[in-house]
Regions:
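Acidic/His- and Gly-rich active-site-bordering loop/insert found
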Residues: 2-131, 155-158
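Acidic/histidine-rich catalytic neighborhood of metal-dependent amide-processing enzymes
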Residues: 131, 135-158
Length: 158
């Protein structure tokens, strides 16, 4: 293993509890399609606490429809975008290098029927080293890693 990889993996291991805590908090916020507002408020507070520039907005449906690639999904037809804001946290660089854009989605598929779950879908419980809960892997886990990358980018000169 390369020295850089060893440093990063060692660092991640040292942050394990913090990473798990953040992901568990996010998993415990139900964010079924159409009901993402509370989870987006959580992300807003998270970005603000990281001293990022934060921007939120609800997409303009009429403007979206003008785009040639617009596709009206079933969830869009059912829920639209009211109370489903996009939340962006921006960290401006100080140099002339390239930018990076980390993104993810906070909505999850309904856990129904709840009776089919071995572990509660909003628990974020850990069993045998694995976290269980709606969104733990898709995509709240990815959001958690994005959060860590932004927090720690300068440590690894990324």
């Amino acid at each position: 293993m390369k020295i850089v990889e060893e440093k990063i993996l060692g660092y991640l291991d040292s942050k394990r509890d913090e990473i798990i805590d953040f992901l568990r908090k996010l998993v415990r916020i139900p964010s079924v399609v159409g009901e993402e507002l509370e989870a987006q408020k959580f992300m807003y507070r998270t970005f603000r606490d990281m001293d990022l520039e934060v921007d939120t907005w609800e997409p303009d449906v009429n403007e979206l429809r003008k785009h040639p690639a617009f596709f009206e999904t079933t969830s869009f037809r059912k829920y639209g975008y009211k109370n489903r804001p996009n939340v962006i946290g921006k960290l401006r660089g100080g140099g002339g290098g390239s930018s990076i854009f980390l993104c993810g989605h906070i909505d999850v598929v309904s856990p129904e029927p709840i009776s089919d779950w071995t572990y509660p879908p909003w628990s974020g419980g850990i069993v045998n080293g694995k976290m269980y809960g709606r969104g733990a892997a898709d995509q709240k886990g990815g959001i958690c890693i994005n959060d860590l990358c932004v927090k720690e980018h300068s440590r690894f000169r990324i």
